[in-house]
Amino acid sequence: MAKEDCIEMEGVVLEALPNTMFRVELENGRIVTAHISGKMRKNYIRILTGDKVVVEITPYDLTKGRIKFRSK
């Protein structure tokens, strides 16, 4: 999958799920399940409920995504 195919959206973390998965509410009101990207996992970046994040979603499955960035 090429990077150009991904959709980037901002959202807020609603809850933390097992295995570093998170439920994120996007700015358009949709709720997706997202996991942490590899660089965030490698650098031990902590994500808590209420954090603003940038989520990368594929157009093929709009219910799953990858957390790419955590805002301060």
Curated annotation (Swiss-Prot):
User: Main subcellular localization, coarse class?
Assistant: cytoplasm
Q: Does the keyword Iron-sulfur apply?
A: no
Output one GO MF annotation. ribosome binding
Q: Which UniProt keywords apply?
A: Cytoplasm, Initiation factor, Protein biosynthesis, RNA-binding, rRNA-binding
Compartments reported by the entry: Cytoplasm
Q: CDD domains this protein is in?
A: S1_IF1
InterPro entries on file: NA-bd_OB-fold, RNA-binding_domain_S1_IF1, S1_domain, TIF_IF1
Query: Which Pfam family, an example, fits this chain?
Result: eIF-1a
Enumerate the spans annotated as S1-like domain.
1-72
Q: Which GO terms describe its cellular component?
A: cytosol
**Family statement:** Belongs to the IF-1 family.
Kindly state the subunit structure of this protein.
Component of the 30S ribosomal translation pre-initiation complex which assembles on the 30S ribosome in the order IF-2 and IF-3, IF-1 and N-formylmethionyl-tRNA(fMet); mRNA recruitment can occur at any time during PIC assembly.
Q: Its biological function?
A: One of the essential components for the initiation of protein synthesis. Stabilizes the binding of IF-2 and IF-3 on the 30S subunit to which N-formylmethionyl-tRNA(fMet) subsequently binds. Helps modulate mRNA selection, yielding the 30S pre-initiation complex (PIC). Upon addition of the 50S ribosomal subunit IF-1, IF-2 and IF-3 are released leaving the mature 70S translation initiation complex.
Protein name, as recorded:
Translation initiation factor IF-1
Organism equals Francisella tularensis subsp. holarctica (strain LVS)
